[in-house]
């Protein structure tokens, strides 16, 4: 059976298929387009997906959903969600139990709510249908791509969306990795190179630096922003024209959903026009209160409106190179992916930054991610025998560990560790006759857990009473190939095990937040180490005084009971 690779994009999605002979093909939809809008629309009769949904959005804006990927892994109360909602015509509400965002629509005469994952599953089902109609046979095996900086919760959301769309999700891979796979196939025989992948799509920006040597693609570092892309450029245009309309006609259109979406469509069209022309027109009959709206914008003005966003892209690239201590002149290849990399100003800025270096444009940037994902699907499902052997070494963006004595962060997996990886460490109980242990899991670069991000907790119960330091608890961190973390704790005496797959991170960490955690980790390193030393000395005195306040880490250090093992899979 063939397998497929799906680039589930914020604004457009693309699907490629790997047939039984290992041949890769990007599949066009029933409109003849090789990319499909990530739109879903509900009406009194049916649910429309893709081009059909987008084409009727002006008539049904409040029930047409798009940009849903921006809601993955976020809370309704998130300031980013609140900001996006102002320019969305559809209604987003909070789940009263967990503050997760839900989309509310009218469907067949009833009010319905859908999770972001459910909406995305409909888009995935459409991509599956496109492949099956083209091949004339069922296809269920799929590799789905995500931005490199998607956290564990967002990866779970993507995998869940695939599962409920009746896909067998072979793997979740990073978009830059998929791009690198496609690049590797088109440049067979390359070796010992530094390759920079720049992926600027509709809603996210990823940049990854790869070292290619002996067929091994090692990610040296990844960066980017999960909330930077073509949709943000559209929003800048929209806000500009909303202000212009208000200035000319003394009327605010922001509360009229139909007007907002008609303007959004016109702005998207103008943005595309400005990639090939120096001037674009906005012409919307009866936009609001019977007022026709006609205006123009130059490419120069558009570039000024988005100047800070464009420069942010350069800043992310510079950060990656600085952290890797690599001079930009030593980058051998620059590969562009994502439709927004075709904006002339973006290309010009990157070319100037890299002193005129030409980009690698061997694959269509709108299709390269799906192409690489399709290759990976073929390799996993055993149809990739004609592909060169490519080994990819992905890394963790942040350190992960548990809280120990006095709120100290004990890392089991360090930042930039290659995955998949499994690490175990043995700890001891804190109190005499302790019968349960609370495991608190954090990510971040600070010494104290209060300065890091809590991503999960669970409890190991039923521990037989014993003097403190006697009972051995083995904690295991297992990060799989998809970057998803599972943590387990085992009582070595009873063999009782509790585990949790971390899919309930309290807050989505943006690239800015992750970078801040890394910078703070370096900035406060000396101060944190001194605080840790004082805590250890304090707890040592308490231990000698026979007071029952020792925690895992101190107990295992003082009693010499710590064991650590590592297994790269």
Curated annotation (Swiss-Prot):
GO BP terms in the entry: chaperone cofactor-dependent protein refolding; protein refolding
Give coiled-coil spans as residue ranges. Answer: none
- Keyword Nucleotide-binding recorded: yes
Superkingdom per UniProt: Eukaryota
Q: Does the keyword Chaperone apply?
A: yes
GO cellular component term of the entry, any: cytoplasm
Recorded GO terms, molecular function?
A: ATP binding; ATP hydrolysis activity; ATP-dependent protein folding chaperone; heat shock protein binding; protein folding chaperone
Database matches in SUPFAM superfamilies: Actin-like ATPase domain, Heat shock protein 70kD (HSP70), peptide-binding domain
Name the UniProt key words of this record, in alphabetical order.
ATP-binding, Chaperone, Nucleotide-binding
- Pfam families for this protein: HSP70
Q: Which InterPro entries match?
A: ATPase_NBD, Heat_shock_70_CS, HSP70_peptide-bd_sf, Hsp_70_fam
PANTHER family in UniProt = HEAT SHOCK PROTEIN 70KDA (PTHR19375)
Protein role: May function in protein folding and assembly, and disassembly of protein complexes.
**Could you tell me what this protein is called?**
Heat shock cognate 70 kDa protein 4
The organism of origin for this protein: Dictyostelium discoideum
The organism's taxonomy opens as: Eukaryota, Amoebozoa, Evosea, Eumycetozoa, Dictyostelia
